[in-house]
Amino acid sequence: MHAACSCFDNGNSGMSRFVNLELGGESEEQRPQKKTLVKDEAYYHAEARSAFENGSFELALRLYSKVLEFNPNSAEAWTGQVRMLIEVGHHEEARLWADKALERIPRDAELLAAKAVALGRCGDLQGALAFSDSAIEERGDSPYVWLARADVLLARKESRADYCLEKALTLAPQDWFVAWLGARIRYYYKQFVVALKLLQQAVELNATHFLLWLELGRCQQTLGLAGPARHSFEQARQLNPNCRDAGLELTRLSGMGAGPRLRGWWRRLFNR
């Protein structure tokens, strides 16, 4: 262990040797410099994934673009961009971007799955099913491929979507990320009660992630569960004091009257 001491070298060679000994035999000049951060493909890919996991979809979109600057054939980056466009609601743009990506990488399962979701949300339900079929044929062990299948089937109003979501969760049983993505799909299709259960599952797997508490609170608020929603927003703010959305949601919740709570009761009743 290196000693922590404050010494001044006044030209005394003995003192210099003493400092060298205390520092493990190396002077300041001899010690290796701190490594410079290399911003390469791996760096931007990790940053993009982190942004995705924190719900910063537009930032993730830009970061996946940086990955493609280093590697124009990165299937993960192309798929990531398509998925981020879907998350921010730009479904037609996501479809066009998926077409461009598939010109380079025509048989990537998750890219095919993302294209299927984009088509489904654009209303091309037959095309969505065809691309989802192709994705499963390419790689049936990917949780995202099954999440995408569920998305497509929900767009088609088919009950088989339940099986597909369960399949995704079975393939990644301890992965909060997959449970969270499943919840976002359910929420998009206004299946709030089932979304709530998936968010609760995600929180159990990763209780220290502010975003899960934030989205849990939003789902609870939508269902008229004011007390639990307040608790969830407070947890989100405690875990991330810089989360402005948590504060805004708490303010909005304070202004909720009986009307929204009653509407929430009806939602719960008819979502069973």
Residue spans for each PLM region:
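Structural signature of tandem alpha-helical TPR/SEL1-like repeats
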Residues: N54-R62, V88-K100, C122-S134, L153-K167, ...
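TPR-adjacent "capping" and linker segments in tetratricopeptide-repeat scaffold/adaptor proteins
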Residues: E22-Y43
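Alpha-helical adaptor scaffolds
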Residues: V117, Y144-E204, L211
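Helix-start (N-cap) detector for alpha-helical repeat units in TPR-like alpha-solenoids
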Residues: E41, A75-E76, A109-E110, S142-Y144, ...
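TPR/TPR-like alpha-solenoid helical repeat scaffolds
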Residues: D151-A155, R218-Q221, C243-R261
